[in-house]
Amino acid sequence: QYPWGFLYYRAYPQSIFLPFGRPYGRFLYSILRIDYIDWEGYAYVGLTAFAGTLFFLYILVSKFVQRKYRQITSITYNRQLNILFWASLASLLFSFGVPFILGLERLIDFIGPIRQMRGIARFAWPFFYIMNILTIYWLWNWWKSKDKNLIAASVTTVALFMICTDAYYNVRNKGKSLENIMPALTDQNNEDPDNQWLQRLDLDRYQAIIPLPYFHIGSENIWLDGQCDIINKTFISVKNSGLPTMGSLLSRTSLNQTIENVSAITAPSCKNYYLNRYPTEMPFLLLVARCEKKYPHEKELIRHANWIDSTGVFDIYELHPKAFKIIQDSLFSNVVREYSSVNLHKFRDIYTTYSIRNFQFLTFDSLLNDTSFFGSGCLSGKAKNRTILYTGPVPSDDTTRTYNLTFWMSNIRTDLYPRTMITINETDSLGNKVNTLNFPVSKQIMQVSGNKALIEYEFHLADNSNQLNISAQNRILRNNMIQFDNILLRPVTTDVYISDGSTIWKNNFCYCKTD
């Protein structure tokens, strides 16, 4: 598995040589567009190194024009600096993505462990140091060769002044950002009001902390960023309690372990890989932020936990591992009760809470496939192409403009697949594009079953009479196949039920009783 962002976090000539972020470079923002450059792609070398680069390139071109080919490699009279110059120049070109951006992206598959270096813009850093050293070295020798005349001295002084000026802007106001402004983090004795709950609990009774809203960042495939400042609160609690956490904010995390943790926190499915995976039967501590930004499955965890303490910003609950099974059985019983209701309306094998069919449900059983999820077929297509999940009108006869899209996707435990992008285009009766929505699968996982995941996304329409075109694409997977099944589009006010006897689907979520 390789980390994402090899070419995304690359440098550009303007992010290396132009003074963006400097007071004397503010005018550039009105001239050049730089919104496509990620912050990790910036490594401004400074005015001195920029001028030195132009000068040395001029020398190289002059020698080439004069056919002094043997002298081209000699920028200075110092052999070591000449070697460093060419090495730093090669490193700079690599930071730009050369040669891969020249239509040779396929070569990335053959560079071995170098591909593990996610942000290649960092390869511009050697150029920053070497070019500044080389420029000052050349000016110093020029000054000495001119018998220390005024012009050479002035140019060298200006170059040194600009290096110092750029160095100042590099560190200006950095001190404030490095100061620790979190008393709770440096509280050694847990005396801070936000930490006093740690003194009131026997922490040895618990195996880990589960933060809610849940967050998990770092697998390069799943991105659940949490809400309500839960990340800071969680890591302060981890540091002061000594307990591990099921939340993650790391640069590299096992994808399979990520899916295991995510599957435990999201809606329970029929294939519970997590019921017996915990090392002990000790309970968990739920760290629950006081906000409304929680998913229904997170609220279920809270409902089946016992409140034990609180602070000014969050509540603490105790959750026993057996609660995961209890929650699944409870949800199954509730769905069975709803499914058995006489108030539901039947449309072939589908039951809904609305009397008129105002949903679209696509099973793709006519597209026979040996690797289908449910039934006899599924939708599949090459990842690099746009696979159309749905095209047509929105479900009719509904007054709301808020809709819910769910679908199942395969290979969720395989590298790169969760990075698939979903695009929703809305067009009017004349074919004019009204709105476009994009979202990654990695942020919308709501249920995991084996190597499959249920993706859910809620969106608003400009007008119910408009047409929808929903597609999926993953260019980095190229010719690999991506597969989808059971695509459901419904108004948020309508519930849809399907059953095959032992399993019931409510709004595309899978429910069954545990053994």
Model-derived regions: residue spans:
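Extracytoplasmic
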Residues: 165-378, 383-386, 476-479, 489-492, ...
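Secreted extracellular polysaccharide-interacting domains
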Residues: 379-398, 433-440
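Extracellular carbohydrate recognition and processing domains
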Residues: 431-467, 477
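Periplasmic/ER-lumenal interhelical loops and adjacent helix-loop junctions
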Residues: 1-63, 465
